């Protein structure tokens, strides 16, 4: 005899435990599970838990060398999704000892590693995570956070304004720097490298950094305002990424940038630590996110990627506009924006938030609005997202018929008009267009922008929508 019962047993016999009471130290997950025909939801939910904790496909004798009951993940509740056939939300608890401290990489490797390829599942999506306070305290988080950034920039009481330099690829470093200067001189707070601007043959990174630094210091001197350009440090190796961040700091630049999903969480966390130690702000782009989060029944919701970014570290992150060209349903978007900015967020299924999340004073992240927005969107953006956001107009600045600087002027005037109207008690949602028209009477740059983009709409139905609420 081998001393144990060999063979295969159903996952639900071990990992489905509806009587389990969750602990404050557990990582909790909500999965949207779509089982294959004939697979009970309890078995599908338990299978996910097994593969992401202590399980394998058969009983093994080394199970007897540890306490599986202590370390196994547990599926503690399953509920059907209203309006969907054969779709369930499975709630899972993971013991904290399964995860390495301060490692988003390890957390995701465990929770969303192999399980998404299970044959027993037609589809699987991670909808939300509750990260326990004990685990949060092992992370540095954002390099600086919202309040420290405002203090560094000396900018209060309004959203920050940015612009992505276009065309994103093909400009020489000097012409690129010229566009940066014109936008900053016109009134923007930031300009930005696009996510795929790294170090290509037409514009090597060092040349771009030098011309952009010259542009922002010249604009600062002429306006008396602190300016920044998101210098993209993303590179093919972590060593090269850090070399670029070091050079940016040596130039005196206030902010660098990273593509956190394509660059990876290990690289991102390393860069965030360097930024805190050296006084650099860190702008995060979410390139590749829609590959992971776009489909409603498979992948991972962006609210999970947003929480992971806050743990890994970033002072800004792109997070949808609601009104522009990119995906973003209002209630869902505001839910994960609060998860980025606020210190404590209550469970609220009407906004897609499955768990109450306490961030125990981890610094917050500014949500960046970008993608197909222009001056007519300014009232809605100001009203929806409030002051703690970055409004980034690429084509909505550089597409101005009079040039880059007038495009920046138009956006700054529109923003100041909206903030002033809001502070006077006017309703931006109801009076937004009138507020912009009034401001355009004394700003020819804004008037020209209003004329160009008066008929631009992106009216497409969102792919990712909320489930019907349970009674």
Swiss-Prot record:
Role of this protein: RuBisCO catalyzes two reactions: the carboxylation of D-ribulose 1,5-bisphosphate, the primary event in carbon dioxide fixation, as well as the oxidative fragmentation of the pentose substrate in the photorespiration process. Both reactions occur simultaneously and in competition at the same active site.
Record's PROSITE patterns? RUBISCO_LARGE
Top-level EC class? lyase
Q: Which CDD domains match?
A: RuBisCO_large_I
Matching entries from Pfam families are given as: RuBisCO_large, RuBisCO_large_N
EC number, UniProt record = 4.1.1.39
NCBIfam families in the record: PRK04208.1
Which family, according to UniProt? Answer: Belongs to the RuBisCO large chain family. Type I subfamily.
Cellular location(s): Plastid, Chloroplast
Residues where substrate binds:
114, 164, 168, 286, 318, 370
Q: Which HAMAP family match?
A: RuBisCO_L_type1
Cofactors named for this entry: Mg(2+)
Catalysed reactions listed for this entry: 2 (2R)-3-phosphoglycerate + 2 H(+) = D-ribulose 1,5-bisphosphate + CO2 + H2O; D-ribulose 1,5-bisphosphate + O2 = 2-phosphoglycolate + (2R)-3-phosphoglycerate + 2 H(+)
Name it. Ribulose bisphosphate carboxylase large chain
Residues with site note (Transition state stabilizer): 325
Note in the entry: The basic functional RuBisCO is composed of a large chain homodimer in a 'head-to-tail' conformation. In form I RuBisCO this homodimer is arranged in a barrel-like tetramer with the small subunits forming a tetrameric 'cap' on each end of the 'barrel'.
Its domain of life?
Eukaryota
Signal sequence region: none
Gene name per UniProt: rbcL
């Amino acid at each position: 005899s081998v001393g144990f019962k060999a063979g295969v047993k159903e996952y639900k016999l071990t990992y489905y435990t509806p009587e389990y009471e969750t602990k404050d130290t557990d990582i909790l997950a909500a999965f949207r599970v779509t089982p294959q025909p004939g697979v009970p939801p309890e078995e599908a939910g338990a299978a996910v838990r097994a593969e992401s904790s202590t399980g394998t496909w058969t009983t093994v004798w080394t199970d007897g060398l540890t306490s599986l009951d202590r370390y196994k993940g547990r599926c503690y509740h399953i509920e059907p999704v209203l309006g969907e056939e054969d779709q369930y939300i499975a709630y899972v608890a993971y013991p904290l000892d399964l995860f390495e401290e301060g490692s988003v990489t390890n957390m995701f490797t465990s929770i969303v590693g192999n399980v998404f390829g299970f044959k027993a599942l037609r589809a699987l999506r991670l909808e939300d995570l509750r990260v326990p306070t004990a685990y949060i305290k092992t992370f540095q988080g954002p390099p600086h956070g919202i309040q420290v950034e405002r203090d560094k920039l000396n900018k209060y009481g309004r959203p920050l304004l940015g612009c992505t330099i276009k065309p994103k690829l093909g400009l020489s470093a000097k012409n690129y720097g010229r566009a940066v200067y014109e936008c900053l001189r016109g009134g923007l707070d930031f300009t930005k490298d696009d996510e795929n601007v790294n170090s290509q043959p037409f514009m090597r990174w060092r040349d771009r950094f030098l011309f952009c630094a010259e542009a922002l210091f010249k604009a600062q001197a002429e306006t008396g305002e602190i300016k920044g350009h998101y210098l993209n440090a993303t590179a093919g190796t972590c060593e090269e990424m850090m070399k670029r961040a070091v050079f940016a700091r040596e130039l005196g630049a206030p902010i660098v940038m990273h593509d956190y999903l394509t660059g990876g969480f290990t690289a991102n966390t390393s860069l965030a630590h360097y930024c805190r130690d050296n006084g650099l702000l860190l702008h995060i782009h979410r390139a590749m996110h829609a590959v992971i989060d776009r489909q409603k029944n498979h992948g991972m919701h962006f609210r999970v990627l947003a929480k992971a970014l806050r743990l890994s570290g970033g002072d800004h992150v792109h997070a949808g506009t609601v009104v522009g060209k990119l995906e973003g349903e209002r209630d869902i978007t505001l839910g994960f924006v609060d998860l980025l900015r606020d210190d404590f967020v209550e469970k609220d299924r009407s906004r897609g938030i499955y768990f109450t999340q306490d961030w125990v004073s981890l610094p917050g992240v500014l949500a960046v609005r970008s993608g197909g927005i222009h001056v007519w969107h300014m009232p809605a953006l100001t009203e929806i997202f409030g002051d703690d956001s970055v409004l980034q107009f690429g084509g909505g600045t550089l597409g101005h018929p009079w040039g880059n600087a007038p495009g920046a002027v138009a956006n700054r005037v529109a923003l100041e008009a909206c903030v002033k109207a809001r502070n006077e008690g006017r309703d931006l949602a109801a009076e937004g267009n009138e507020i912009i028209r009034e401001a355009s009477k004394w700003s020819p740059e804004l008037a020209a922008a209003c004329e160009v983009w008066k008929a631009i709409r992106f009216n497409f139905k969102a792919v990712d929508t909320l489930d019907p609420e349970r009674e």
